[in-house]
Amino acid sequence: SDVYKRQIVGDPKQLPPTNFFSSNRIDEENSEKEDLESLLDDCLAISMPQQYLKWHYRSRHESLIAYSNMKYYDNKLLTFPSHNDLISKVSIIHPEGHYDKGRTKQNKAEARAVVDEIIRRMSDEKLRNDSIGVVTFSSVQQNLIDDMLCEEWANHPELEELDRKSPEPVFIKNLENVQGDERDVILFSVGYGPDEKGQVSMNFGPLNRDGGWRRLNVAISRARKAMIVYSVLRPEQIDLSRTRSEGVAGLKGFLEFAERGKLAVTAHSTTKSTSDSTVTECIAKAIKELGYGVKCNIGSSEFKVDIGIIDPDNEKEYLLGILLDGENTLHSSTAQDRFILQPSVLNGLGWNILRVWTLDWFDDKDRVLGNIKAAIDSAPKHEAETVPTSKPAVYSTSQFEREEASALTSAFAQPYVLSLIHISEP
């Protein structure tokens, strides 16, 4: 009989089919409905041949995917740092307010802050070029923000018209239906938090369920350029001794990251060979002697920009990035990846890139330094970015922000799985 080859593509770290909203009336906090079985899970269970797709392209700033990569993908996604990698693009705002747990299950303070930010961005000729998406934990909070925005559209019909004509209009979605969507800027309303008496429940609706961490992973990986988290809840108010939910533990870690911009990264993802480190340090030292600020091994995944030269006129950005023929070369399977694709991706993220060969450095250091100086002098400057709505955290990938690292253990499936199924025709 003939055999047909089938490819099943999916990500077991994100949402499988769900029956969460199969009922017309759902109590999100107390629902015990489960995710449905997926064909992908069946393929994994019987150990079919698999191929992992590791390159990540959506996020134009590495901080936007850094938490998911570390927490859920075991740092196996290959991500690329951007030229302004010194500042995190995940920020957090804590509005003054509370979560109305007993009655409406709404958080009006967060909803108001989200809608105000939408109107502010749509009213700015430059900011309105970035598309906007709103993500909420619950459908109740989603509906509240939707209603508030409709009221604002009525007061600003010209802004509603601009949004209507946009190729990517504003969307407002919850955890259950945002998968597959993306926008330049994501505004994330947590919703849950202290009630009017200041008491915090450890019930976060669908996040508490088995697999709730998948919902969090979906929610925090929708942004291309920036993510602003709105939360009356602070990470220290989440008591993990009162819950065993992986989703709640993930939320606590993400709120800490949004506040501090720091991640705990496993040692294997940042280790470089001694010879590579020596060459990198020698070149970096020589550049420092020219009077420039320098940072080495930039990036939170396996891929690194070996040396970044900080712009003396804007210390939040790199003026030039240098790639050496070391670890990055070993991690690239083809010459096209090394010499075409990687520099192309970095150029698209705003980098000015110069490649330096180790043998050239040992052969004629002065000539290589001259080439570096010429590249610095000719590097185009980047436009100053608009001041964000909240002070961004300094982005680092070298420190733990909690005493116990167990809360940051990786999940149990591999990322981006492609399985082959052989089907015999009867």
Question: Regions from the language model: what does each represent?
Answer:
Residues 347-412:
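Basic, glycine-rich
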Residues 182, 195-200, 330-338, 364:
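Active-site-adjacent loop/helix micro-motif of nuclease/hydrolase catalytic cores
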Residues 3-4, 421-425:
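Short, small-residue-biased leader/transition segments that mark boundaries at the very start
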Residues 286-318:
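Active-site metal-binding core of divalent-cation-utilizing nuclease and nuclease-like domains
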Residues 213-227, 339-354:
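Metal-dependent nuclease catalytic cores in nucleic-acid-processing enzymes
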Residues 308-344, 361:
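Short beta-strand-loop-alpha-helix junction that forms the active-site gateway
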Residues 1-282, 296-299:
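Conserved helicase motor core of SF1/SF2 NTP-dependent helicases
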Residues 290, 295-297, 342, 348, ...:
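Catalytic cores of nucleotide-enabled group-transfer and carboxylate-activating enzymes in metabolic
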